C-alpha cells in the first residue's frame, strides 16, 4: 500500500490570509477543530468519505499529513509538497522522533482514561501543579513503551516537552464537567525491531484524538 507524506501550507494569497481568524483561531481547542475541518478540504471527496489521514500542526499555517491518498490541491492552500513515504528501515535502525499524542489506557470495566489525568487524580489538588510535568514524563514514557511492544520498536529515550488538557469545542458547561483530552508533546529516539510492522502501525497513528491532530509520529534517522 502506498502512503504519502505531505507538507501542506495555507496559501499566502491576501484573500485567504484575510480569513486567518476563521482558518486558524487563537484559542487552542477551537483551532484544533478548525484545522481538522480545513484539512478535510484537501482529502474529502464526498459525504461518505471517512478520515483516512493523520495530520500535525507545525504552526504558521503549516501542516504535515500522512495519508493513503495524496491531498487535493485547492485555493485555500499553497502548492502541496507530496512524497511517497517508504523509509528504508531494517531491524536495529535508530530513529529520532517527535509525537503529539493523546495517551489513554483502559481501566477495569472498559472505560478509557487519559494516562496523565488519571495519575493526577491521585495527587492532592494543591500539589497537582508541581506534579504535572513529572507525572507527564513518567506516564508518557510508560505509555510509549507499551506502544512500542505493539508497534515493533524499543523506546530508547523520550522527553515529554509539554502536557496540556484541551476542552472540546462547543462544551461550555461547568469546567469540571467539560469533556477534555490530554495532549503530550514528546521527542526522543527509538530502535526499530520489525520494519514492516513498525511502518504499518506508524501509518495508523498512535493514541487517540487523531481527528484533532494527534497521533502522527515524524521520524528521521538518528
Residue ranges and their predicted role:
Residues 1-222:
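RNA-interacting cores
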